[in-house]
Amino acid sequence: ITVDFDGSANGSFYNFCGSANPDCVDAQVFGTNIADLYNGDSTIGGETVYRGTAVEDIPDKAESSGTILKFTASYRPSDDVLLYATLSEGFRPGFLNRPGGYTSSDGSYTVPFNFETDELMNYEFGWKADLLDGSMRFNGSAFMSVIDGLQTTIFDPSIANLFFSDNSADAEITGVEMDLIWAPANIDGLTISGGLSLLDTEITKVLVPTDDVRKGDSLAFAPEMQANLQARYEWSLEGGAMAHVMPHMSHSAEQYSDIIRINRDLIHSWTMLGITAGITTDTWGAELFIDNLTDERAELSRNYINDRERVSYARPRTMGVRLTYNF
């Protein structure tokens, strides 16, 4: 995999050039010559004046190559139970840094011109089971993921006055996920389903000398618990119609929006309730729904894009009717 700035916003930063305008003279409006910094000729035009010295052997591409593996073994102790174990790898390719070559005030760290891939090793054990004479299906997995060289964007003025990225930390993730669907044999028309996720995430080692990333912090968008539950009950009406009612619930524990402290914000926990009820025939159907029954101001996401705090909320209490007709 090869990535570079050619034809991108970084490759033609304020110069209106790039692959879309090949005849354009490479002249930057504000003196920011990103294209010259990464053109592979071992010199830095205008940047040489700014820094006082040329930097040699600057890469013009970030290249990654290798092999990732996935291995799965399964075992059936009975016709109703499947057990499996999976070992898998993953990665994200590296990239180039705009402020490559900048050095921290104490000289202990230099922003890399290109940073490396981050790598993930995942260990998983899972099961799929039909229980209670086939009336219940219960699936789940327990897993651990180890991340080496986690790519992170950092803003630390003691190093550079621009955001830069590096393999800034190692991290671990452990968790359990499960889902269930159950149709009790002694209650005709009732179906109960739900899901549960438990997570424990942690930065285990900081690789860049900055306070932006801290050992022991959790990863971004990783709530310790998420759950959902719904129960649908159906019954027959005169004339062959079917009626149904289904209350449902979803919950998320608190989480954080980023791993770097300057952008890290708490996303509060929330619980949302809802209900649907309706009638269905062979030709038509009508359903009343109420989502977010308690009008919970649920925070789904937070970010600091363009240095402004932004919060994405769930829709407020919403009521409506769905109508269907089969031709």
Question: Which ranges hold each PLM region?
Answer:
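Outer-membrane beta-barrel strand-turn architecture
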Residues: 67, 75-79, 119, 129-133, ...
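Transmembrane beta-strands of outer-membrane beta-barrel pores
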Residues: 1-2, 87-93, 100, 131, ...
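Membrane-embedded beta-barrel scaffold of Gram-negative outer-membrane proteins
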Residues: 76-99, 114-176, 180-183, 197, ...
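Short sequence motifs at beta-strands and strand-loop junctions characteristic
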Residues: 59-67, 116-119, 168-174, 219-226, ...
